[in-house]
Design a protein with these regions (language model features):
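A conserved active-site cap/scaffold subdomain adjacent to cofactor or substrate pockets
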Residues: 44-50
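Mature-region segments of soluble proteins
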Residues: 1-22, 34, 39-41, 55-58, ...
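A short linear-motif detector with a strong N-terminal bias
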Residues: 26, 42-43
């Protein structure tokens, strides 16, 4: 199985690709299977309807912008897959409805807020306008009846940020960006000291060590 194109993301770990570990002792078969499944996430929605899909795709792009990142973490697809599979955290704030309901209500309310102000849905707004609206959500200033009693501030913190950011950093492309080697099972991590690293960990580049770090990272397995 090929790893696809190497990441061109801006990172302090140049030329590091965690997927190079796929066939090494860093990952066991269970880890490989989990990562393969994550990389194969369907890009077409199974939970969200067409209107919700447009809204959540735009929302993900504002929470974690990836305009200059390749390859892109498919955030909306990962969220859709989680909801379609009835996966949840196993707990929730009592002021929020169940996860699937919260997302349906939240996206509908977000579009309702936008249409009330200018007649357009969230996905059709300029990015600056979208950002301003999300700022209002973060402060709990969105109170359209479409929220159905769910606090917009709580939806922002407990669903929007929690789910989208969590899904981003669950993906191997994001691991490569931050120099994370994944579960490292069964190999593990050994040199647990300040400024020490195992040979199978990524090398962080300093201002004068970019080429050295890139060379080392191409050999990391």
């Amino acid at each position: 199985m090929t790893n696809g194109p190497r990441s061109t993301r801006a990172t302090r770990y140049p030329d590091y690709d965690v997927l190079d570990k796929r066939t090494t002792p860093s990952w066991d078969e269970h880890t490989r299977a989990v990562i393969a499944d994550r990389l194969a996430t369907p890009l077409e929605p199974r939970f969200f309807n067409a209107v919700e899909w447009l809204a959540v795709t735009s929302l993900c792009a504002r929470v974690v912008p990836q305009a200059n990142a390749q390859p892109v973490v498919p955030l909306a697809a990962l969220l859709d897959a989680r909801l379609a599979g009835h996966s949840n955290d196993g707990y929730r704030d009592a002021r929020l409805p169940p996860m699937r309901d919260a997302w349906r209500i939240g996206l509908a309310a977000l579009d309702a807020e936008c249409r009330e102000r200018g007649g357009l849905p969230f996905a059709s707004l300029a990015q600056d306008t979208q950002n301003a609206l999300l700022g209002e959500m973060q402060r709990g200033e969105l109170t359209n009846p479409a929220w159905r009693g769910m606090p917009s501030k709580l939806f922002f913190s407990e669903r929007v940020l929690h789910d989208i950011c969590g899904l981003y950093y669950s993906h191997p492309h994001a691991w490569s960006e931050i120099g994370f080697g994944g579960p490292a099972n069964p190999r593990g991590y050994v040199r647990m000291y300040l400024n020490r690293r195992d040979p199978w960990e990524a090398v962080e580049a300093r201002s004068d060590t970019h080429e050295h770090a890139a060379k080392e990272n191409r050999r990391v397995r």
